[in-house]
C-alpha cells in the first residue's frame, strides 16, 4: 500500500491569492498570515500574485480565472463575511463557499478556503491573527500541502 500526503514545502511552487477588500482590516491580516506561511515554507515572493477583489462575492470568479491560467499550483481565497441584521450574510456566505468549491473542481487546481464567516467583527478579529490563530495562515498551509499532493498524483 502506498500512502500519498502533501508536504509543507512551497519552494518552486506558484501561488495566486484572491483577497476581498470589503472588511479590509480583516482581509489584510489574513493576507499577512498567508504570506508569512508561504514564505516560511520556502515560497519566493516572485512566485506569489495577489488579486484584490471588491467583496467576498467576487472571490470565486477570480479564483477560477487564476486557477485556469495554468500559472499557479494553488490558489488561496481570503476574506470575511460578517453577519448583519439582514439575511444578506446567508446568501453571500453560501454562494462564496459553493463558488470556491466549484472553481477548484472545474479548474482541477487546489483552491483553499480562507474566507471567514462570522457572527461578529470580534470573531473575525480572533480568527485573523488573534486568539484563534490566523485562518489566512491555515489556508496557505492547506494550499501548499494540496499542491504537493496533486503533483505526486501526476
Curated annotation (Swiss-Prot):
The active site is at residue 88. One of its GO terms (cellular component) is riboflavin synthase complex. Pathway: Cofactor biosynthesis; riboflavin biosynthesis; riboflavin from 2-hydroxy-3-oxobutyl phosphate and 5-amino-6-(D-ribitylamino)uracil: step 1/2. Pfam families: DMRL_synthase. Its EC number is 2.5.1.78. One of its GO terms (molecular function) is 6,7-dimethyl-8-ribityllumazine synthase activity. InterPro entries: LS, LS/RS, LS/RS_sf. 5-amino-6-(D-ribitylamino)uracil binds at residues 22, 56-58, 80-82, 113. (2S)-2-hydroxy-3-oxobutyl phosphate binds at residues 85-86, 127. One of its GO terms (biological process) is riboflavin biosynthetic process. This is 6,7-dimethyl-8-ribityllumazine synthase. The lineage of its organism: Bacteria, Pseudomonadati, Thermodesulfobacteriota, Syntrophobacteria, Syntrophobacterales.
